[in-house]
From Swiss-Prot:
InterPro entries: Ribosomal_eL37 (IPR001569), Ribosomal_eL37/eL43 (IPR011331), Ribosomal_eL37_CS (IPR018267), Ribosomal_zn-bd (IPR011332). This is Large ribosomal subunit protein eL37x. The lineage of its organism: Eukaryota, Viridiplantae, Streptophyta, Embryophyta, Tracheophyta. It comes from the Eukaryota. Its cofactor is Zn(2+). The gene is RPL37C.
Length: 95
């Protein structure tokens, strides 16, 4: 039997599983290394020959739960835990 179409029916073991850092199914179980982000290496795997891939994965393509609010909070100098001063009646009646 060759390595072509007939052999694909015999392939039943997963070599890759989910990566805890990038979430893709690229973590090689035996090597303990992610082929997409190079986890557990400290530096994330990116190459400039795959500009399109960088564009797909870069900041801004996901939820950005924290980063989405930073520009708004920056305007007020990241103040927290304060209450707005009550407006005076003069400005309220003129409006």
């Amino acid at each position: 039997m060759g390595k072509g179409t007939g052999s694909f029916g015999k392939r039943r073991n997963k070599s890759h599983t989910l990566c805890v850092r990038c979430g893709r199914r690229s973590f090689h179980i035996q090597k303990s290394r992610c082929s997409a982000c190079a986890y557990p290496a400290a530096r994330k795997r990116t190459y400039n020959w795959s500009v399109k891939a960088i564009r797909r994965k870069t900041t801004g393509t996901g939820r950005m739960r924290y980063l989405r609010n930073v520009p708004r909070r920056f305007k007020t100098g990241f103040r927290e835990g304060t209450e707005a001063k009550p407006r005076s009646k003069a400005s309220a009646s003129s409006a």
